[in-house]
Amino acid sequence: MSSAGLLSGVEVGSTTVTATKDGITSNTVNVTVCSSLAGTCIDIFDAGGGKLFTSSPSVAYLDRIGGSATSGTITENGDYGPAGDFYIFDWNNANALCTTYNTLSLGGRTNWRLAERDELKMELYDVYLNMFTARGWPTDDYYWSATPVGSFYYYVVLRNGYVNSYTPSDTVYASCVSNP
């Protein structure tokens, strides 16, 4: 642990952490260190100002936390995301995923929602470029947005910034966002 109180993982595995300072003891928290996001972890990324984005969940992660409605799986081969299996979602199930995160108070927050097109494109891709390179996210498939266009919804490709739209029944990745 750093002098600023930052904990850094040095080995893959799980543990619990409790901190004490000036006679005050914190709550105990569970900490899991993963070798990649294909494991039982998810990336909760602060893109600035406390605004958090999640990577799309792996099968291992979502199953570990109790699951949510999904629409299938995709296997990343390591070219555009960490090698492993990830869930994909139709638009309704993508929204349900964010509701699941609220129920679980993911990252201590209960205001998770599906990211808007401009949040994915302008706040993630335009700033950090390829999210697999930047953060280890799966990017072989598109990411749903909450932004409608007629009876469709926009998606953003987080490996190249491409934006287009799909019908709500199509199945792709999902990133949930939480404002501070």
Where are these regions (language model features)?
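Beta-strand-connecting loop/turn residues
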Residues: 4-5, 23, 50, 151-152, ...
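Extracytoplasmic soluble-region selector
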Residues: 1-37
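Extracellular adhesion/carbohydrate-recognition regions
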Residues: 34-112, 154
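Surface-exposed flexible segments
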Residues: 15-23, 63-70, 124-136
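Generic recognition of long tandem-repeat/solenoid scaffolds
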Residues: 5-9, 52-55, 156-157
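An exposed tryptophan-centered "aromatic clamp" motif
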Residues: 95-113, 117-170, 175-179
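Acidic surface patches and DE-rich sequence motifs
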Residues: 2, 46-47, 158
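Short, isolated positions in well-ordered beta-strands
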Residues: 26, 52-54, 163-164
